[in-house]
Amino acid sequence: MPLRRAVFAILFASLGSPLVAAETPLRLERLERCGDLLASERQEWCLRVRGLGSGLPRLLLDGRELPATALRREGDGLRLRLDRRGHASGPLWLEQGGRSSNPVWLTLNGSHVLAAGPDEVAKNMDGLTTYVDLVSLLIEENHDGRREAERLADKYGARVVGAIPPLNLYQLRLPARDLVQRDALVLRIGSETSVDAVVVEESAPEKGEETEAARRPVDKPDSDSDEWAANRFMDAVNYYQRRVRARQAPLETRPVRIGVIERDVDFDAPDFADYLGPCKAPAPRTCLYARDAERPDNHGSTVAGILAARWDQGGNSGFLRGLDRASQGFQVIVERNSDAGITANVAASVNLVEDGVRVLNWSWGIHRVGARDVDGDEVDSLVRSGIAMSGYEELLEEFFLWLRKEHPDVLVVNSAGNGSSYSGTDEYRLPSSFVTEQLLVVGGHQRSERQGLAVDDPAYAVKRSTSNVDMRVDVTAAACTHASTLERDARGEVHCGTSYATPMVAGTVAAMLSLNPRLRPEEIRMLLRRSAMTIGGDYDFEPADAEDLTAPILPSERGYRLDHRDVGRSARLDMQKALDLAVKSRERVR
């Protein structure tokens, strides 16, 4: 017995030693506004940290240490009080015991909304989870939004708890205990002349666009299939490296900031392990800012990995990471604001745009209840009720109107969806159905089983069976990729969906902007379509079954040649040629 006690004493002593503590990873899992979300000058932030030792850690914002007096320990979490004066938005990370956490982007902009807790939701008549007492009001633009929201809150016994001020949107907590009371209040508030729309949130926050239609089995390519070859991924990396650093005529590039609307990334995976702490290197490099995830194969890790994963570690390989040593660096910011569904996605997007993002990756989308796929069956993937869809439509319309007015150089890249349905039917699919020059819609393809074809052969790739289609889709890209893993040099599971085609295009757009930052959204779309390879048959602009993969290639996109073999076919991303046209656009004046 004395010997056993001695062994346990040594074991407990070793667990409490600094050496063991130093081996425990420090991870920042949550960073959200708390307290008064409407306060702009003095802000409160709540942090949840894994691996936090005793005492307070060092907290650094964009490389500057924040005073210890601004930080308070709350169990396993921290509360930060930050004075906006003297600070700017930037990466925030912790240091303790020789360890550095993952950096997370902290925005000082004022768009934040609350997510409902588990006791604040209910099932509606469609069987969908909906918020009981939290709704958002879009106030008419001729009113002072904050003042009018406060007036309406007083009138109906509610409280203003969140806001997206640039869109004149304010979130109210209603005095409603069930959906009958909520719907009655929504009808009354919606009839106010100052209210443009009421946004009712229906949220399934743990799911993104990652799930393909579950009601039919879908074949995935073999794990050793080089899906990205169909978009000339390696050719594009090689071209960028050689052309930018060419001895005869080197190119000057610019840094680009990309926003990815996702929840988190697993920094325990080898793909992302070297992004911990400050993003410093002798030369500019790709930086990644995100909350830490529990699993390496989650949606956010896979989407972000296509842009930023470290090479030769197994799992994924990031396109922008492959441009290091030639580029001036890319900042990839993974941000979701909160788990308040579509409203939070828009709030995060507004903050990121105000923080200088040029490209937004939206690997998400929703279908209305009752939407039909190309076979006439009902879509059961990511559906929302009619009342929610009408509010979302108004919210997204306000976002794109604001984007066109205040930030006309920003481009949103959006997934077409995985419902085997139509992307352009505005009454059934959002946001891909919006027609605006600042929204690029991406469909998905995979390698065909035919052997010996040239990469530019239209039959080299085929449409992913679950990918949404029609003429609103601008271009297709590889829909299948490998997930990240916890094991070094291990091959991850194959994940498929238009979610993963979207960052292929977003990364290409970011690289194009680094080569020519003067490119406008409509010019980027034109260059992507002019450079595109083709996929599918030649339908002479009108497929017999009305299933356009993308908008057909036009003669104007092929030098006005009516007899060009590409005319009438659908567009498949050519990453290398798109970069080449971006370089040539530096000298051309239209």
Locate each region found by the language model.
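Substrate-binding/access-modulating region of protease and related hydrolase catalytic domains
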Residues: 334-434, 488-503
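A short glycine/threonine-centered beta-strand motif
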Residues: 41-54, 63, 132-142
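Extracellular S/T/G-rich loop segment that most often corresponds to the catalytic His/Ser-adjacent loop
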Residues: 262-264, 429-514, 518
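Protease zymogen maturation seam
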Residues: 112-128, 187-257, 269-271, 372-374
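Subtilisin-like serine protease catalytic core
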Residues: 125, 240-344, 355, 369, ...
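C-terminal subdomain of the subtilisin-like protease fold in secreted/lumenal serine endopeptidases
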Residues: 357-362, 438-439, 516-590
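Surface-exposed, short loops/turns at beta-strand junctions within beta-sandwich domains
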Residues: 83-89
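Beta-strand/beta-sandwich contexts
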Residues: 22-57, 99-127
